[in-house]
Each structure stands twice: as structure tokens, then as C-alpha cells.
Amino acid sequence: MDATEFRKFGKAAVDYLADYLENLRDRPVLPSVEPGYLQEMIPKEAPTQPETWQDILQDMDRVVMPGVTHWHSPHFHAYYPTANSFPGIVGEMFSAGIGCIGFSWITSPACTELEVAMMDWLGKLLNLPKEFLNCSDGPGGGVIQGSASEATLVGLLAAKEKMVKILQADHPDWDQGMIKAKLVAYTSDQSNSSVEKAGLLGSTPMRLLPTDEKCRLRGSMLEQAIKEDRENGLIPFYVVGTLGTTGTCAFDDLEELGPICNRENLWLHVDAAYA
């Protein structure tokens, strides 16, 4: 595909998506297909020759759309909002078109600095203390993660590393292996499955704590778990609260959890699904 064909395909794709989103309310939210439906509609082997973009658009209607759950439909009331928008789609187009990899400043200065600026904007909108901002003299500054699941895992790994450094500074004779074997994290039994998976990937026990009658994690439940684990020689270090759990849309009581985490020196990560 050359630039001329790309222009045609791109304009046709924009028209397709605009029509789709404009008429989304007329589509059934859930697809009426059975598991494995798509395998019967596509070749068994990867094509050896490319298809035209016109054929690809036809395949969108014939193969893909029948199996789509329409998250942006006004009739969709499950899970959490995904915040799609026309400007967001155009932003994704620019991101994909430029296609830079921003793992360091020199790989794409604009990518790195735009992320820093946007996260500072968000911090100011949330009225966070200046210590949380990149423009302060402290260690603050935000980083955009690829998904909520990734953010939970990265938070766990960062909290784990921080706790190991703190304990080794206080107890130079303690080795990392001994410390990590005693670390324990907490979340509610209503949290997303990705939280428990973060514990598995981070080689850390993730205790699923019981919730109250409104399916919320409360401070008393966390305090009891911390007390039990400390008495058993374990080291609490990480708590995951949720704003809008997947199954029940429960909001954990952060006003109770926050002070406990401060007092006990635990890292509090919030899965802000409904933020």
C-alpha cells in the first residue's frame, strides 16, 4: 500500500467508524454468536497474498462486527466506562502513524515530555500535593501505564523494592531472599482478578480480605489482617483498594484505608476503575 492508497483507505475507515459510532444505539449490545464462530469465517491458514482494503472493510462487517460487544453503546451498563471519543480516536491515529517507542528521552523527546506534562496536568486537576508533581523538587511525577492490570503489577513491584530497601537499611544482616519470602499484600475479595494475578506474577501472597454488606473493604478488616500477619512473622507492604469493583461496583473505604496505610507504612494502590 502506497501513500495514495493509504489516504483512500484512511478516509474510508474514518467514514466507517463515524457511521458505526453515530448509529451505535441501534445495534444490540451483545453479539448473538457462539464460541468459535470466527474460525469458520476466516481461512485456516494465513493468506499468502494481501487483500484489498475494500475487502478488509467488507470483512469488518462480515466477520468482526457480528462478534463485537459494543462497550460504547448507550445501552451498555456492564463493567466500567472505556472513555472512547472522536478526539481520542484521532489521537490514536497520530500515535500509530508516528509510531515512536518512548522508552527513554532520546528515543522521542516529545513523547517523553508530553507524558510528563499531561501527568502534571492530571495531578493539578486532582489537587494533589505538589510533591506528587514532576515540576516539584521532590521525587514526584506520573507515568502512563498500558493498562490497569499493568499498573497494579508495576505498583506491587515498586512497593516490594521500596520495602526491601527500607528493611535492609534498618537490618543490614537481612538478605533480600529472606525479606521477600515474608512479604504479604492485601486486597478485597471483590477486586478484579488482575489484582490477584499481580501477586502471582510478583511472587507475592495476595490476601483476599472479606468485605462488608456493601461489598466494600473497610479499615477494620485491613487492620485485623495486618495484626494477624505481623504476629505470624510476615511483613505487610502493599494494599490495593478499588473504586468500582468489576462484579459489584463497590467502592472501598479509602478514607479508612489511607490512614492505616500511612501509619503502618504500607503502599496504597488504587484501582480507580470508575474514576
Region roles according to the model:
Residues 250-275:
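Catalytic PLP-binding core of fold-type I/II PLP enzymes
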Residues 81-238, 247, 255, 259:
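PLP-dependent aspartate aminotransferase-fold enzymes
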